[in-house]
Every structure is written in structure tokens, then in C-alpha cells.
């Protein structure tokens, strides 16, 4: 049995979002193929997720802890942010497989997804500094990145390259990409392009 972590990084539903629709299509196929696997879904836009962002409170809390302060001496807000940040790091570390689904907005990933990426790019946990340079501490995981783009980029856009680079940096060597592309540029081909992407999502669900 494997553990799959799903990171949903779009505030809309599958009826309104192509990336979420592809994610749901993938999950339906994956559940059918892997009925005993554990699946955790992290919706970075859900209020209950309480996604921490690196801000003054978090930075000052880390500084105090590095200086030897006890966790209990931090403010209540600082304790909550540090604890939640650590929980998300541990959640990623416990997963065997990771699926990330997001739109490309303004040539980049959504800000909430960037905040989540910060929680998995942690010195001493997912990578370490050595005399030879940074070394990954994460191994044995694989990832699937689902992204919707209005035009055709074929994985050469900054957003998908950023996700792949971070995952590679911390040791996730296998990062596959599923892109829902071109629908805004070619609305007359919308049905064809969307159906092609959903077919690929179904296939990934069977093989991932």
C-alpha cells in the first residue's frame, strides 16, 4: 500500500477549473486501480488548511528557536504557524507519491502553491548543506504535476519548470507533467484538447 498526497491549488471546482477537472479524472482512475492506497488531499485554498506563509512572525520565531529559545516562549500565533509549517513538511515526507494540480496564472504558480512549496523545501529535512553544496534528503518518491495553461508551452513555462526544479532539488527525480493546454488560444478546438487531456489523466491514474 502506498500513500498519495494530492495538492489541489485552485480555489474553483471541477466545473469551473480545467486543472481540477483533470485532477478529479486522475483520482477516479487512481482509486479504481489502487483501492487500498491511502490518499490525502490538501486543498491549499480551503480555510481549514490554514496554509502558513513566510512572514515576519514566522521568520522571527525561527530566529528565536535558532538562538535557543524554548518553543513555549513564542507567541501563540508564532507557535501555531511553526507547528503548521512543520506538519505540512512531515505530511510531504510521509507520502510515497505526490500529485500537484494548479493553473498557470500570469506565467507563474498560484501564491498559495508557492507557500506550500516553501514547506517542503526545508534545510535539514528535505535537503542539507554540505561542503560540496546542497544535497537532497528526499528519495524514493515520484510526482505528477497537473497544470492548465491557456496557450501551448509543453513544459517550457516558468511555472512547471519551477515545480520540477524544486522537486528535483530535494530528491524527487521522477516528475511527470500533464498539461491541459491551448484551449484559450484555440477555442474552436476546446473539446478536442480537453478530451485529450482527460484521456491522459485517466491513463496516469492507471500507471502512476
Curated annotation (Swiss-Prot):
Cofactor: FMN
Keywords linked to the UniProt accession: Flavoprotein, FMN, NAD, Oxidoreductase
Keyword NAD: yes
EC top class named in words: oxidoreductase
Reactions accelerated catalytically: 2 a quinone + NADH + H(+) = 2 a 1,4-benzosemiquinone + NAD(+); N,N-dimethyl-1,4-phenylenediamine + anthranilate + 2 NAD(+) = 2-(4-dimethylaminophenyl)diazenylbenzoate + 2 NADH + 2 H(+)
GO molecular-function term, one example from the UniProt record: FMN binding
InterPro entries: Flavodoxin_fold, Flavoprotein-like_sf, FMN-dep_NADH:Q_OxRdtase_AzoR1, NADH:quinone_OxRdtase_FMN_depd
Binding site for FMN: 10, 17-19, 104-107, 148-153, 184
Enzyme Commission (EC) number: 1.6.5.-, 1.7.1.17
Pfam families per record: Flavodoxin_2
Record's cofactor remark: Binds 1 FMN per subunit.
SUPFAM superfamilies reported for this sequence: Flavoproteins (SSF52218)
Family label: Belongs to the azoreductase type 1 family.
Biological role stated in the UniProt entry: Quinone reductase that provides resistance to thiol-specific stress caused by electrophilic quinones.
HAMAP family named among the record's database cross-references: Azoreductase_type1
Assembly behavior: Homodimer.
Name of the molecule in the record: FMN-dependent NADH:quinone oxidoreductase
Organism: Enterococcus faecalis (strain ATCC 700802 / V583)
Lineage of the species this protein comes from: Bacteria, Bacillati, Bacillota, Bacilli, Lactobacillales
Amino acid at each position: 500500500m502506498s500513500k498519495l498526497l494530492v495538492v489541489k491549488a485552485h480555489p474553483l471546482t471541477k466545473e469551473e477549473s480545467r486543472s481540477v477537472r483533470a485532477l478529479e479524472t486522475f483520482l477516479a482512475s487512481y482509486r479504481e486501480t489502487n483501492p487500498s492506497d491511502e490518499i490525502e488531499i490538501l486543498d491549499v485554498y480551503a480555510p481549514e488548511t490554514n496554509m502558513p506563509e513566510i512572514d515576519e512572525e514566522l521568520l522571527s520565531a525561527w530566529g528565536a528557536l535558532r538562538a535557543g529559545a524554548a518553543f513555549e516562549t513564542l507567541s501563540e500565533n508564532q507557535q501555531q504557524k511553526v507547528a503548521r509549517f512543520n506538519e505540512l513538511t512531515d505530511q510531504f515526507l510521509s507520502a510515497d507519491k505526490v500529485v500537484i494540480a494548479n493553473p498557470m496564472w500570469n506565467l507563474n504558480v498560484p501564491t498559495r502553491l508557492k507557500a506550500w512549496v516553501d514547506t517542503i523545501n526545508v534545510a535539514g529535512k528535505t535537503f542539507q548543506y554540505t561542503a560540496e553544496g546542497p544535497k537532497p534528503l528526499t528519495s524514493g518518491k515520484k510526482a505528477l504535476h497537473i497544470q492548465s495553461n491557456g496557450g501551448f508551452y509543453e513544459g517550457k513555462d516558468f511555472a512547471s519548470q519551477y515545480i520540477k526544479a524544486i522537486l528535483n532539488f530535494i530528491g524527487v527525480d521522477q516528475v511527470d507533467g500533464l498539461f491541459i493546454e491551448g484551449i484559450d488560444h484555440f477555442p474552436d478546438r476546446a473539446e478536442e484538447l480537453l478530451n485529450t487531456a482527460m484521456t491522459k489523466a485517466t491513463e496516469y491514474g492507471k500507471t502512476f
